[in-house]
A protein has these predicted regions:
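P-loop NTPase catalytic phosphate-binding loop
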Residues: 1-12, 18-21, 38-167, 180-259, ...
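Interdomain "pre-motor" coupling segment immediately N-terminal to P-loop NTPase/helicase cores
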Residues: 22-38
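Conserved alpha/beta core segments of nucleic-acid transaction machinery
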Residues: 6-7, 42, 287-332
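Conserved helix/coil segment N-terminal to the catalytic DExD/H
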Residues: 173-178
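Short catalytic/ligand-gating loop segments at beta-alpha or beta-beta junctions
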Residues: 162-172, 323-325
Length: 332
């Protein structure tokens, strides 16, 4: 991690195991699964994944960990206030506890302007940004430019791979002569995807930006894995207009929190079921064709503030990561 590892006591005390076991399920809902309990579990601590994510506990009370690097992207969808943002925060916390700033950068796109403000504290440690832009992307125009810059970053990395006859980021980093030459993984988190991709009104410029954003996301999802660029896409509007066939084809790993209708569940998972979830972080996790019901890890806003404040306070050398300017030459 940083100067020292992020201590688990930044997070609230775990709930004893007997409080979250199957026989404690009441009224169709499980007890809260604290983030601290899953991050302290051997399933996460001993995981050898490149980008381990402790998403929650199964209904057999086992910690569920998956590798975002293999996922390689994640779609999170469902009705409002059913656990979508909490799932995103669990992903971020998992990665902060497992990767050094030199190994990982985040890009946050927050069109609502209220979900990711605490993560601005990650600043020069964990964020990748355009030069001179806000650390948390909030406007549609800035989102379009940032995604275009990520596409250029991706193509620049592919150019390096082709020169060295290397196939992926893991091989590239193993052959790097110095730590400074290694590439960090870049995890781009997009909250309320629909706000960025559905044009506002009939203005041609708005339609153009929406189209460019969609095309950039699909391009990154199709090619980003090999060079360490991964997308997490979230929406509370799981309609076919938002979650298109192209999006579904490039996001085989999905999380559905409770949906309003059976149809919404089918849009997310290709099957019903999410409409019957209990809410409060109760979710269905799908990877390829396999599905599993999970009680999502919960991290409170207070815990997020403590965690990001701790990262901000660390005195180790900061490693800011500046994305290439859109339409500029790829950086060396």
């Amino acid at each position: 991690m940083l100067t020292t590892s992020c201590p688990l006591d930044l997070l609230d005390e775990y709930i004893p195991e007997d409080k979250v076991s199957e026989d404690k399920i009441a009224n169709g809902r499980r007890a809260v699964v604290r983030m601290r309990s899953v991050l302290g579990d051997d399933a996460f601590r001993n995981c050898k994944a490149e980008l381990p994510v402790a998403i929650g506990r199964t209904f057999g009370n086992k910690v569920k960990v998956f590798d975002l690097a293999k996922a390689p992207h994640l779609l999170i969808a469902g009705a409002t206030k059913q656990g979508k943002t909490v799932a995103i925060n669990a992903v971020v916390a998992s990665l902060l506890y497992s990767k050094h700033p030199s190994e990982l950068k985040f890009v946050f796109l927050d069109p609502k302007g209220c979900e990711f403000s605490a993560y601005s504290r990650l600043g020069g440690h964990y964020l990748a940004t355009l030069s001179g832009e806000n650390p948390i992307v909030q406007t549609k125009d800035q989102a379009g430019k940032t995604l275009e810059a990520l596409c250029e970053e991706m193509e620049a990395r592919y150019s390096h791979l082709s020169v060295g006859s290397i196939s992926n980021i893991v091989e590239y980093n193993k052959q790097a002569s110095t730590p400074q030459e290694r590439w960090p993984y870049i995890v781009t988190i997009i909250d309320e995807y629909a706000d960025l991709t559905i044009p506002a009104g009939r203005e041609e410029e708005s339609r153009y930006i929406s189209r460019e954003i969609t095309e950039s996301i699909i391009r990154l999802a199709q090619k980003g894995r090999a060079v360490g660029i991964h997308i997490i896409l979230a929406t509370q509007r799981p309609s076919k207009k938002v979650i298109t066939d192209s999006i579904k084809a490039t996001f085989p790993t999905r999380i559905a929190v409770r949906t309003m209708t059976r149809t919404d569940s089918r849009v997310i998972l290709d099957s019903p079921g999410a409409e019957n979830l209990a809410g409060g972080g109760d979710m269905i996790f799908k990877i390829d064709t396999e599905t599993e019901r999970i009680q999502g890890s919960y991290i409170s806003p207070e815990e997020i503030n403590r965690l990001t404040t701790y990262v901000e306070s660390q005195s180790c050398k900061k490693t800011p990561y500046t994305l290439p300017e859109p339409d500029s030459a790829p950086k060396a």
